[in-house]
């Protein structure tokens, strides 16, 4: 009995412990589990609803996509049809354009080929004509005949006279031309009483004064002031040069500064002109004028064919002494004996270039030498040397054309083939066979 009661009490204690400590946690666990199951059921219901909604939305999207795809297909078909029509129209226009352009190209090529054929035929004709002319003028008699025919044509021009002025006069205005005439007359009066040595000294001193005036621009400007009273200018030149130059030179300088000059450089040109006239007067007294003229023109032609020499003689980076030294070396190495007057004239020209090309200055000097005798220079180029009769006839015809005695300076150029090329001052008469062939070729179509 006591055992039973003890067991009962133990059982009761166990039940109490279970109820007190085990049952509450189990209840809470069961409640939590129930709540979780209930939440899961709610979530499942919501998921089912969302599934239903997504199924409905998918169906609607599929229907919309089908409608959109049908619309896109319809639009694409319409665009394709329109593009096809446009391409067909453009293809037709392009075909017409290509056809028209092709026709124009054919016409252009035909025209070009025709022009090219004409050009080639023209050049061939000119070439053949040139060969015929060269074969024809290979005979000296026939070549001489071309000169005679040109002289016949030139003879017909004789009534048309041209006015050719003295070389230096063409560079000056009216006041300077009058001054140069007066100064030249004064120089002529003074020079006739001087011997050759005095004339040479006068020439040298005038060149020295011209060089000084070229350097001293202020002095030159004062000496050419166009004032009525020439006294101040005369007194200045006397103060500057009295005792440094000869009396004759000083007298000429007084006369020079007493004149009215249009430009400062005209006074220097006039002094250079008088220095040349002094040397040419010496040549005339020694009967060397023809030799001087010939050698001057020969040196001028040398400068034409030797441009490097002309450049060196006119190189202002080199002192004038160096350029004069080069000139003397060239003259000393010449195959002929150079006249001392020619050497002096060329030296003075190099010393007083004053910006002019050497070849132009020497050519001008040669023309001055000829003009002293009242002659006009005619530069004549021929394929062969002229006979004495042809040279005389040419001189006579040109003298009648220009109304002045003419000095013919002949230059041989075999490339001219026949006829003559004549240059007087700025006027050129070209009657060469080479120029006629060139003119015929120039008239060919491009």
Curated annotation (Swiss-Prot):
It is found in: Cell membrane. The keyword Transmembrane helix applies. In the N-terminal section; belongs to the ATPase B chain family. In the C-terminal section; belongs to the ATPase delta chain family. This is ATP synthase subunit b-delta. Signal peptide: none annotated. HAMAP family: ATP_synth_b_bprime, ATP_synth_delta_bact. It comes from the Bacteria. F-type ATPases have 2 components, F(1) - the catalytic core - and F(0) - the membrane proton channel. F(1) has five subunits: alpha(3), beta(3), gamma(1), delta(1), epsilon(1). F(0) has three main subunits: a(1), b(2) and c(10-14). The alpha and beta chains form an alternating ring which encloses part of the gamma chain. F(1) is attached to F(0) by a central stalk formed by the gamma and epsilon chains, while a peripheral stalk is formed by the delta and b chains. The chain crosses the membrane at residues 4-24. Gene3D superfamilies: N-terminal domain of the delta subunit of the F1F0-ATP synthase (1.10.520.20). Residues 169-446 are annotated as: ATP synthase subunit delta. Residues 1-168 are annotated as: ATP synthase subunit b. Pfam families: ATP-synt_B, OSCP. GO terms for cellular component: plasma membrane; proton-transporting ATP synthase complex. It is a single-pass membrane protein. SUPFAM superfamilies: F1F0 ATP synthase subunit B, membrane domain. CDD domains: ATP-synt_Fo_b. GO terms for molecular function: proton-transporting ATP synthase activity, rotational mechanism. Keywords: ATP synthesis, Cell membrane, CF(0), Hydrogen ion transport, Ion transport, Membrane, Multifunctional enzyme, Transmembrane, Transmembrane helix, Transport. It comes from Mycolicibacterium paratuberculosis (strain ATCC BAA-968 / K-10). F(1)F(0) ATP synthase produces ATP from ADP in the presence of a proton or sodium gradient. F-type ATPases consist of two structural domains, F(1) containing the extramembraneous catalytic core and F(0) containing the membrane proton channel, linked together by a central stalk and a peripheral stalk. During catalysis, ATP synthesis in the catalytic domain of F(1) is coupled via a rotary mechanism of the central stalk subunits to proton translocation. This fusion protein includes a component of the F(0) channel (subunit b) and of the F(1) subunit (subunit delta). Two copies of subunit b and one of delta together form the peripheral 'stator' stalk which links F(1) to F(0).
